[in-house]
A protein has these predicted regions:
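Intrinsically disordered, low-structural-confidence terminal and linker regions
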Residues: 1-2
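Conserved Class I S-adenosyl-L-methionine-dependent methyltransferase catalytic core
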Residues: 15-116
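Short, catalytically relevant binding-site loops at active-site mouths
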Residues: 44-45, 128-130, 151-154, 177-180
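Amphipathic alpha-helical segments that form well-ordered structural scaffolds
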Residues: 104-108, 112, 134, 155-159
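Conserved class I S-adenosyl-L-methionine
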Residues: 117-127
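Conserved SAM-binding loop of SAM-dependent methyltransferases across substrates and taxa
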Residues: 128-140
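Class I SAM-dependent methyltransferase SAM/SAH-binding core
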Residues: 142-167
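S-adenosyl-L-methionine
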Residues: 158-182
C-alpha cells in the first residue's frame, strides 16, 4: 500500500491552488475573480461569515474606535478579486470575513508592538498580500517583504501593484530566489 495515500487529495488541492494563482496572473478576467475561484478558496479566502463576526468582535474588544476609524480603508482589500462579502451588525455596507481576519491580525500586531515603530516587515507565506494591504492602512512601514512560492509571489506582485501607496514599498520574493535578508 502507498504510504502517501492520505496525501493525494492534499497534493491535488495544492496543485489547483497554484494553477489558480498562475491563471490570475496571466488573465485579467481570472484576476478580477480570483478570491471567488473554488481552486483558490481551498487554501485562502475561505473564512466563514461567523468566523468573520468573531474576528470583528475581537478587534472591537481591542480598540473599537480604531475599527470604525479605519474600516473603510480596510475594505479596500475587498475591491479586487471579487471575494464573498457580508453585512455585519453596526457596519455600513459589506466586508469579506478574510479581511476581518487580516484586521484581527493587524490589531494583534499593534497590541504586541505597543506603539513601537516598525520600518520593515517580512512575511513568509503571505497569500495574495491581503495582510500587507490591511496593515498598511494603520502602520507606516518603509518596506514589506513577502516570501512565497513563485506562483504566489507573482500574484502578490500583481495584486499589490494595484495600490499606488504600496507599489514601491513591497518586495515579493519567490522562495526559490531569496538571499539573506539584511536589516
Amino acid at each position: 500500500q502507498d504510504d502517501r495515500s492520505g496525501w493525494q487529495a492534499e497534493d491535488q488541492i495544492a496543485v489547483e491552488y497554484l494553477e489558480a494563482c498562475k491563471e490570475a496572473v496571466a488573465s485579467d478576467e481570472a484576476f478580477a475573480n480570483f478570491k471567488s475561484n473554488p481552486k483558490y478558496k481551498t487554501i485562502l479566502e475561505h473564512v466563514l461569515k461567523d468566523q468573520g463576526q468573531a474576528y470583528l468582535n475581537i478587534c472591537k474588544d481591542m480598540n473599537e474606535d480604531a475599527v470604525w476609524e479605519n474600516i473603510e480603508a480596510f475594505k479596500e482589500n475587498d475591491k479586487i478579486g471579487n471575494p464573498e462579502l457580508y453585512p455585519y451588525p453596526g457596519m455600513k455596507g459589506t466586508i469579506s470575513p478574510t479581511t476581518l481576519r487580516y484586521m484581527k491580525n493587524t490589531f494583534e500586531m499593534a497590541f504586541m508592538l505597543d506603539g513601537a515603530e516598525i520600518s520593515k516587515v517580512v512575511e513568509v507565506g503571505g497569500g495574495y498580500g491581503g495582510l500587507c494591504r490591511v496593515l498598511s492602512k494603520v502602520c507606516e512601514f518603509d518596506e514589506y517583504v513577502l516570501i512565497d512560492l513563485p506562483e504566489v509571489s507573482a500574484l502578490q506582485r500583481k495584486y499589490l501593484d494595484q495600490f499606488p501607496d504600496l507599489k514601491d514599498k513591497v518586495t515579493c520574493i519567490p522562495c526559490t530566489e531569496y538571499e539573506e535578508i539584511k536589516d
